[in-house]
């Protein structure tokens, strides 16, 4: 997160750019939230270039006091999950090189969801 305007807007970026994504509640403030069983956006995923970038983003998210909803190692990728100001899900992730993807004995992809060690990841931000 590069900038936050109270609880009404946040600007996200990677690589030093001022912002790639702007999130705000300017038009929706005070409006009703959709019912939990309604269709709609589940989450937006933002691909980061490498593990060091994911670590740097995690550091900034935590420094800004934004709560994480989760963190996972999917075998092919590592991801952190949070909510935007409107409550929409945001996934920030990095892909592993295809040569590192987990494979079953028959060669098929063996993705999963394991805990992501955030302390080990954060050490890469330093």
Language-model features, listed with the residues they occupy:
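Short glycine/proline-enriched turns and hinge-like loops at secondary-structure junctions
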Residues: 5, 35-37, 73
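Core segments of cupin and vicinal oxygen chelate
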Residues: 1-26
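Short beta-strand/turn micro-motifs at beta-sheet edges
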Residues: 29-34
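Vicinal oxygen chelate
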Residues: 17-18, 39, 45-101, 109-111, ...
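Generic serine detector
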Residues: 7-8, 13, 28, 53, ...
């Amino acid at each position: 997160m590069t900038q936050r305007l109270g609880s009404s807007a946040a600007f996200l970026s990677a690589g030093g750019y001022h912002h790639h994504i702007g999130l705000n509640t300017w038009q929706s403030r005070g409006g009703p939230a959709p019912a939990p069983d309604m269709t709609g956006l589940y989450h937006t995923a933002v691909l980061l270039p490498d593990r060091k970038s994911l670590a740097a983003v995690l550091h900034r998210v935590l420094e800004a006091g934004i709560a994480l909803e989760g963190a996972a190692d999917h075998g092919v990728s590592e991801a952190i999950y949070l909510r935007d100001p409107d409550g929409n899900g945001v996934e920030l992730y990095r892909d592993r090189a295809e040569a590192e993807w987990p494979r079953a004995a028959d060669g098929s992809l063996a993705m999963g969801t394991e805990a992501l060690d955030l302390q080990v990841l954060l050490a890469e931000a330093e």
